[in-house]
Amino acid sequence: MIQQESRLRVADNSGAKELLCIRVLGGSKRRYGNIGDVIVATVKSATPGGVVKKGKVVKAVIVRSKQGVRRNDGSYISFDENAAVIIKDDKTPVGTRIFGPVARELRDNEFMKIVSLAPEVL
């Protein structure tokens, strides 16, 4: 469950290391985001020489969440950390690699490029 001021790790090689959530997109009263939701965030720390610089406002999709998500068969999946992948306006990732596992729910939200780049889909 991601809300305003939540900090997330970046799971790609765009150059950013940590994000701070500014807003969860999808309605004016929307407070919380989970796996597959798009957020607006700012880059809090970045690696030198990366594509994304510190302080830049970006869009990102949540790929891992400690809260977890319920599946249709009744099972739950949760992760050890909150992580996101920085995306462009056309829902393609800025980076060329994805680190760590991602949830299968991204496939339902038309993030097939992220799913195909991920080393493991749970």
From Swiss-Prot:
This is Large ribosomal subunit protein uL14. One of its GO terms (biological process) is translation. The gene is rplN. It comes from the Bacteria. Binds to 23S rRNA. Forms part of two intersubunit bridges in the 70S ribosome. Keywords: Ribonucleoprotein, Ribosomal protein, RNA-binding, rRNA-binding. The keyword Transport does not apply. SMART domains: Ribosomal_L14. Part of the 50S ribosomal subunit. Forms a cluster with proteins L3 and L19. In the 70S ribosome, L14 and L19 interact and together make contacts with the 16S rRNA in bridges B5 and B8. Belongs to the universal ribosomal protein uL14 family. GO terms for molecular function: large ribosomal subunit rRNA binding; structural constituent of ribosome. Pfam families: Ribosomal_L14. PANTHER family: 50S/60S RIBOSOMAL PROTEIN L14/L23, LARGE RIBOSOMAL SUBUNIT PROTEIN UL14M. One of its GO terms (cellular component) is cytosolic large ribosomal subunit.
